[in-house]
Amino acid sequence: MELPKPQTVQQLSDKLTVPVEDLLLPCRFCNSFLTYIELREFDYKNLQLIWTQEDFVFACCSSCAYASAQYECQQFYELTVFGREIEQVEQQTIGLIVIRCQYCLKCLDLIEKLDICCSHQAFHKVRGNWKGRCRHCKAIE
């Protein structure tokens, strides 16, 4: 039985017994190698490594993550709800709804979700998935 492939940068580092700072992980979209900061951001955003059938592994650099998020919002936008309306639409509490940042693709934590709800800001449904603004992108906007 084949062992599951690592899904995070840290898991890949552990499996290969190579420090994260020594990993050379290419971006799936632009083929540039991710910097150390981007490798750490990749896991912080709760993104998953991309494996090919030939067992090549790829990640996504920050620039391509922003570009991909923007493209998805422009091409696959479905609807917008404000604040707690998302719970009515999804029939779930906010803590159980998976929401990613509409700009950088970071998976939002509960505090970020509640902040959007309490300030009655927008959640957007894009390609069947919910998007909002993370604390980092909110701070620079």
UniProtKB/Swiss-Prot annotation:
<keyword id="KW-1048">Host nucleus</keyword>
<keyword id="KW-0805">Transcription regulation</keyword>
<dbReference type="GO" id="GO:0030430">
    <property type="term" value="C:host cell cytoplasm"/>
</dbReference>
<keyword id="KW-0479">Metal-binding</keyword>
<dbReference type="GO" id="GO:0006351">
    <property type="term" value="P:DNA-templated transcription"/>
</dbReference>
<feature type="zinc finger region">
    <location>
        <begin position="101"/>
        <end position="137"/>
    </location>
</feature>
<comment type="similarity">
    <text>Belongs to the papillomaviridae E6 protein family.</text>
</comment>
<comment type="function">
    <text>Plays a major role in the induction and maintenance of cellular transformation. E6 associates with host UBE3A/E6-AP ubiquitin-protein ligase and modulates its activity. Protects host keratinocytes from apoptosis by mediating the degradation of host BAK1. May also inhibit host immune response.</text>
</comment>
<comment type="subunit">
    <text>Forms homodimers. Interacts with ubiquitin-protein ligase UBE3A/E6-AP; this interaction stimulates UBE3A ubiquitin activity. Interacts with host BAK1.</text>
</comment>
<keyword id="KW-0010">Activator</keyword>
<keyword id="KW-1035">Host cytoplasm</keyword>
<dbReference type="GO" id="GO:0006355">
    <property type="term" value="P:regulation of DNA-templated transcription"/>
</dbReference>
<keyword id="KW-0804">Transcription</keyword>
<dbReference type="Pfam" id="PF00518">
    <property type="entry name" value="E6"/>
</dbReference>
<keyword id="KW-1090">Inhibition of host innate immune response by virus</keyword>
<keyword id="KW-0945">Host-virus interaction</keyword>
<dbReference type="GO" id="GO:0039502">
    <property type="term" value="P:symbiont-mediated suppression of host type I interferon-mediated signaling pathway"/>
</dbReference>
<keyword id="KW-0244">Early protein</keyword>
<dbReference type="InterPro" id="IPR038575">
    <property type="entry name" value="E6_sf"/>
</dbReference>
<dbReference type="GO" id="GO:0003677">
    <property type="term" value="F:DNA binding"/>
</dbReference>
<dbReference type="GO" id="GO:0042025">
    <property type="term" value="C:host cell nucleus"/>
</dbReference>
<protein>
    <recommendedName>
        <fullName>Protein E6</fullName>
    </recommendedName>
</protein>
<dbReference type="GO" id="GO:0052150">
    <property type="term" value="P:symbiont-mediated perturbation of host apoptosis"/>
</dbReference>
<keyword id="KW-0862">Zinc</keyword>
<keyword id="KW-0238">DNA-binding</keyword>
<keyword id="KW-0863">Zinc-finger</keyword>
<keyword id="KW-0899">Viral immunoevasion</keyword>
<dbReference type="GO" id="GO:0039648">
    <property type="term" value="P:symbiont-mediated perturbation of host ubiquitin-like protein modification"/>
</dbReference>
<dbReference type="GO" id="GO:0052170">
    <property type="term" value="P:symbiont-mediated suppression of host innate immune response"/>
</dbReference>
<feature type="zinc finger region">
    <location>
        <begin position="27"/>
        <end position="64"/>
    </location>
</feature>
<dbReference type="GO" id="GO:0008270">
    <property type="term" value="F:zinc ion binding"/>
</dbReference>
<dbReference type="InterPro" id="IPR001334">
    <property type="entry name" value="E6"/>
</dbReference>
<keyword id="KW-1119">Modulation of host cell apoptosis by virus</keyword>
